[in-house]
Swiss-Prot record:
Disulfide bonds: none annotated. Residues 287-290 are annotated as: G3. Keywords: Cell cycle, Cytoplasm, GTP-binding, Hydrolase, Nonsense-mediated mRNA decay, Nucleotide-binding, Protein biosynthesis. Component of the eRF1-eRF3-GTP ternary complex, composed of ETF1/ERF1 and ERF3 (GSPT1/ERF3A or GSPT2/ERF3B) and GTP. Component of the transient SURF (SMG1-UPF1-eRF1-eRF3) complex. Interacts with UPF1 and PABPC1. This is Eukaryotic peptide chain release factor GTP-binding subunit ERF3B. The lineage of its organism: Eukaryota, Metazoa, Chordata, Craniata, Vertebrata. InterPro entries: EFTu-like_2, G_TR_CS, GTP-eEF1A_C, P-loop_NTPase, PAM2_motif, T_Tr_GTP-bd_dom, TRAFAC_GTPase_members, Transl_B-barrel_sf. Residues 1-49, 72-124, 146-195 are annotated as: Disordered. It catalyses: GTP + H2O = GDP + phosphate + H(+). One of its GO terms (molecular function) is GTP binding. GO terms for biological process: nuclear-transcribed mRNA catabolic process, nonsense-mediated decay; translation; translational termination. Residues 349-352 are annotated as: G4.
Length: 628
């Protein structure tokens, strides 16, 4: 303590440390220094009892606290950091990714340079602890606080869909040297880092699709509750809030519909995300919007999914509305197939409704209408589709067998998911990570699902199509920090060497030795699903391929393909119409990343949309080199 800036700039970690410091080293001047000097002369017990005053200006001594929480962290916009919880650890985590402050061990000597950023710890230290008591857990259990301090802005993209990036609110200003240290190192916490050798549960992405109001978000919320990811108290709070808005049957969906607009209207807009685990697998729920205005968002969700759950309302009138021409049941099932989803679980929901009352006749009626359509889309009724009745609101047949439907002999929903065979994913394939979103948080963070290959911390990668060289600074797999990830995992990767503004959704992270293909012109095979008039060369639409959305023009029609025999016509067609299959040449407005369907199916399937409707689905056959 050689600076004369007064000891309000810093505080001893404990009373033992005060005893160790010589009386002469205390700064002279105000009442603060006299209080410290007085404390040094007194026995511990009397000093403690005399000084226990929550209104005291210098500090409130607390013998159980190993460290102090900086007072500037109490602002509402700042995420919580670790308070005195990690107890006996005598390490000072400096520059290890704690953007909001440093932890100090109980017996560690305090250097003056490290003390100064701990601005005025004020007497209301107990108040600080109280304010931070919710997000901070007991000693050693630091996962939640660590997660939030590493990436507070991810809350907007996932937990609060629809918001802008909150990364700009940023951490408080620190010295240049500390900022550099924190950028170069990611947190090293034993409680969060998963060792690369540890056995991992298989990651499975499940997208919930179906017509608006079928009950997708409610089922998602019920799963979160039944698997312990949302506690009873939180649900009771949602129920109270929903009742106040006369929306009491919507409260379960609020676990996934987190923004105010979605709650007020009862409609999912963004793709909500949540996680749950079974004995064998780790699942990510992608709750896709059902309204036709938000189909592009639904396509983004389906492109990341391994498995689709088509939610159908059994309520009289609702099933028919969702399934007829204008409904989203048909379009969603078709888009899920186009996005590469192999398995489809059809949940016939709202079986508890008075118009249905767990009627097997109604269940079979819905099933009979759906099977021919799903077969036409490309799902095999025997291998790819599984039907089950349920009630999202009551939770019947979600986790446990329901007494209301003794006629259903299969497994309930969650046990069925747990017993699915493993998805065979190659860890040796080329690295392909399509970017879904990006934001700033102590650098550039990108979000996406690793389609193939494996990524480790410190690895050098290339961002395509711009060929930016980047370095992996840190990896979060479903909000858990790790050093190594395998295909199928949902990742947040912090990158060095690229700015957030230089990345767009649809860009791909690749291995420098095995880059993905990129271009603007390519030949495709397309099936015209729905279009009233004929389609000729020069027709413009919107292309959805993996996570990329781009304007596209059909520049040429090459041949028609016979649906039954697969034979191609000898002459070039002048136009194509609904239900026809053709080979065509497409040209995008900008350069995009893509692969042929034969080489890499996940990046070779696409959808064409126009005027809010899916007009065609297709696959990439060949990339055409650009003419100089």
């Amino acid at each position: 303590m050689d600076s004369g800036s007064s000891s309000s700039d810093s505080a001893p970690d404990c009373w033992d440390q005060v005893d160790m410091e010589s009386p002469g080293s205390a700064p002279s001047g105000d009442g603060v220094s006299s209080a410290v000097a007085e404390a040094q002369r007194e026995p511990l017990s009397s000093a403690f009892s005399r000084k226990l005053n929550v209104n005291a200006k210098p500090f409130v001594p607390n013998v159980h606290a190993a460290e102090f929480v900086p007072s500037f962290l109490r602002g509402p916009t700042q995420p919580p950091t670790l308070p005195a919880g990690s107890g006996s650890n005598d390490e000072t985590c400096t520059g290890a990714g704690y953007p909001q402050g440093k932890r100090m061990g109980r017996g560690a000597p305090v250097e003056p340079s490290r003390e100064e950023p701990l601005v005025s710890l004020e007497g209301s230290n107990s108040a600080v602890t109280m304010e931070l008591s919710e997000p901070v857990v007991e000693n050693g259990e630091v996962e939640m606080a660590l997660e939030e301090s590493w990436e507070h802005s991810k809350e907007v993209s996932e937990a609060e869909p629809g918001g802008g990036s909150s990364g700009d609110s940023g951490p408080p200003e620190e010295s240049g040297q500390e900022m550099m240290e924190e950028k170069e190192e990611i947190r090293k916490s034993k409680s969060v880092i998963v060792p690369s050798g540890a056995p991992k549960k298989e990651h499975v992405n499940v997208v919930f699709i179906g017509h608006v109001d079928a009950g997708k978000s409610t089922i998602g919320g019920q799963i979160m509750f039944l698997t312990g990811m949302v506690d009873k108290r939180t649900l009771e709070k949602y129920e109270r809030e929903a009742k106040e808005k006369n929306r009491e049957t919507w409260y379960l969906s609020w676990a996934l519909d987190t923004n105010q607009e979605e709650r007020d209207k009862g409609k999912t807009v963004e793709v909500g995300r949540a996680y749950f685990e079974t004995e064998r697998k780790h699942f990510t729920i992608l709750d896709a919007p059902g309204h036709k205005s938000f189909v592009p968002n639904m396509i983004g969700g389906a492109s990341q999914a391994d498995l689709a759950v088509l939610v159908i309302s059994a309520r009289k009138g609702e099933f028919e509305t969702g399934f007829e021409k204008g409904g989203q049941t048909r379009e969603h099932a078709m888009l899920a197939k186009t996005a590469g989803v192999k398995h489809l679980i059809v949940l016939i929901n709202k079986m508890d409704d008075p118009t249905v009352n767990w009627s097997i006749e109604r269940y079979e009626e819905c099933k009979e209408k759906l099977v021919p359509f799903l077969k036409k889309v490309g799902f095999s009724p025997k291998k790819d589709i599984h039907f089950m009745p349920c009630s999202g609101l009551t939770g019947a047949n979600i986790k446990e067998q329901s007494d209301f439907c003794p006629w259903y002999t299969g497994l309930p929903f969650i046990p069925y998911l747990d017993n699915l065979p493993n998805f065979n994913r190659s860890i040796d394939g080329p690295i392909r990570l399509p970017i879904v979103d990006k934001y700033k948080d102590m650098g550039t963070v990108v979000l996406g699902k690793l389609e193939s290959g494996s990524i480790f911390k410190g690895q050098q990668l290339v961002m395509m199509p711009n060929k930016h060289n980047v370095e992996v600074l840190g990896i979060l797999s479903d909000d858990t920090e790790t050093d190594f990830v395998a295909p199928g995992e949902n990742l947040k990767i912090r990158l060095k060497g690229i700015e957030e503004e230089e990345i767009l959704p649809g860009f791909i992270l690749c291995d420098p030795s095995n880059l993905c293909h990129s271009g603007r012109t390519f030949d495709v095979q397309i099936v015209i699903i729905e279009h009233k008039s004929i389609i000729c060369p020069g027709y413009n639409a919107v292309l959805h391929i993996h996570t990329c959305i781009e304007e596209v023009e059909i520049t040429a029609l090459i041949s028609l393909v016979d649906k039954k025999s697969g034979e191609k016509s000898k002459t070039r067609p002048r136009f194509v119409k609904q239900d026809q299959v053709c080979i065509a040449r497409l040209r995008t407005a900008g350069t995009i990343c893509l692969e042929t369907f034969k080489d890499f199916p996940q990046m070779g399937r696409f959808t064409l949309r126009d005027e809010g409707k899916t007009i065609a689905i297709g696959k990439v056959l060949k990339l055409v080199p650009e003419k100089d």
